[in-house]
Amino acid sequence: MWVNTLRCPEGIEKVFPGPFACYNRLFDPGSQLDSYALIEETLHTYGPFDGAFGFSQGAALIVSYLLERRAAYPDESLPFRFLILCSPVVPLAGNAEYCHRILGCLSRDNESRIRSCQDTQISDLPERARIAMTMLTDILDASTTITQEPRRFYLDRELPDVPCALHPDLCLTRLPVATLHVRGTTDAKALWNCGFLIQSFFDSPKLRVFEHKSGHDIPRSGPEVRQMLCAMEWIIAQSELP
């Protein structure tokens, strides 16, 4: 969800010229649309691309972008033949119609339940809102060491600015893209579960899962790096088949 520039660690600019972008902290629908615009600009300026590789928020963002693009333009081909998704977090919506369907019609009492940030209150929300908010709060709790923000930072807002999760039970769009799903066996349970939910968005038979012994990370050991490389080569080869 990169929309702001970031000062990079010393020495990186000698390898990559920049600019260096950082993730958007707000996670709201407007920020999602800003991120989609950056993807569109990149596709237009530097594309076409055969595939995309994403980690954590990057993986979730590319899934969000493709889902909402597919929903808006179902007859258009997608810009990637394959995806490599490593430890994705929750995919978030930018589409106003989807967000309104999930959160926009809530009563003031239900809006207060969201703002309370309490599981006991969120569990009393109408079904669609409860599914989306539970998925979101599980990931927010699991990633606080990264975001350095409590639930209230994201939930105590006007409803149009509350992050809205794309859940496979609520977003029925599916992606016919060859996909490698990579996850660490010691990742937080909520993040591990999120990987399975994201996997549900894909209906291509060209799918492979690679699990490694790290947590919210990519493989680091030599054998696992080689195994992941083999899995990447396999999914790329599959994407080139009819």
Curated annotation (Swiss-Prot):
**Positions of the catalytic residues:** 56, 138, 216
Give the source's domain of life in one word: Eukaryota
Molecular function (GO) terms for this protein are: hydrolase activity
Q: Does the keyword Cell wall biogenesis/degradation apply?
A: no
The record's annotation in InterPro entries points to:
AB_hydrolase_fold, FSH-like_dom, LovG
Q: Which GO terms describe its biological process?
A: antibiotic biosynthetic process; monocarboxylic acid biosynthetic process; secondary metabolic process
Report the EC code(s) recorded for this entry: 3.1.-.-
This protein's UniProt keywords: Hydrolase
The answer, when asked if Hydrolase is one of the entry's keywords, is yes
Pfam families in the record, alphabetically?
FSH1 (PF03959)
What cellular-component terms does GO give this entry?
cytoplasm; nucleus
Q: So, what pathway does this thing act in?
A: Alkaloid biosynthesis
Function as written in the Swiss-Prot or TrEMBL entry: Serine hydrolase; part of the gene cluster that mediates the biosynthesis of communesins, a prominent class of indole alkaloids with great potential as pharmaceuticals. Communesins are biosynthesized by the coupling of tryptamine and aurantioclavine, two building blocks derived from L-tryptophan. The L-tryptophan decarboxylase cnsB converts L-tryptophan to tryptamine, whereas the tryptophan dimethylallyltransferase cnsF converts L-tryptophan to 4-dimethylallyl tryptophan which is further transformed to aurantioclavine by the aurantioclavine synthase cnsA, probably aided by the catalase cnsD.
| Family, as annotated | Belongs to the AB hydrolase 3 family.
Official protein name in the record: Serine hydrolase cnsH
